[in-house]
């Protein structure tokens, strides 16, 4: 024995469509609670400023791959996004929730000396998640990776990515679009 429930619209008690079907198997989620948005991904389109020992440097991810919801500022100045003030190279979502924040950065040095590096997610100007890389050889050139779930209030919290080098020579962030990335998406159900 089999049962079928055939509907074109699944609605809540207020008759708001949560899910619709076009009758051919294509479904559309109409409720934002079921979507991983806002979301974005950006990469470094050109070499950033040189990294100086002991100085936290904001990475200028200036080229967007996508920006669903218009919440990433890929410019060098403060702008208004969805009614919120977003500082340079920051993600400032206008929807509250937990977000998966991820970043990578390709660090290259002109000479081969060991480096220690701190790669950090900054929320509202303070580090909330830090990854430390200690070079085990004389060649530091490599990609730093970082990811964390971060609570965002949807009314002005913003995220930026910084890198700080210690114990070595100055270096720079390379503009490899596949290895110098910054992105975020809202986690469903949070």
Give the residues covered by each predicted segment.
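Extracellular beta-strand-rich recognition modules
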Residues: 97-107, 143-147, 157-164
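Short, intrinsically disordered N-terminal pre-domain segments
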Residues: 1-16, 188-190
């Amino acid at each position: 024995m089999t049962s079928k429930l055939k509907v074109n619209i699944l609605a809540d008690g207020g008759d708001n469509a949560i899910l619709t079907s076009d009758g051919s198997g294509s479904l559309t989620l109409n409720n934002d609670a079921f979507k991983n948005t806002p979301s974005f991904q950006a990469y470094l389109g050109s070499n950033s400023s040189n990294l100086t020992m002991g100085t936290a440097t904001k990475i200028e991810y200036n080229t967007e791959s996508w920006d669903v919801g218009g919440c990433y500022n890929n410019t060098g100045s403060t702008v208004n996004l969805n009614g919120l003030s977003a500082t340079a190279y920051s993600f400032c979502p206008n929807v509250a929730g937990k977000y998966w924040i991820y970043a990578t950065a390709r660090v290259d040095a002109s000479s081969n000396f060991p480096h220690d590096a701190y790669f950090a997610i900054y929320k509202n100007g303070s580090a909330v998640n830090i990854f430390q890389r200690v070079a085990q050889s004389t060649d530091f050139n490599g990609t730093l990776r970082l990811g964390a779930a971060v609570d965002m209030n949807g009314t002005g919290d913003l995220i930026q990515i910084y890198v700080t080098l210690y114990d070595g020579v100055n270096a720079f962030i390379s503009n490899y679009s596949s290895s110098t990335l910054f992105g975020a998406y809202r986690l469903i159900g949070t």
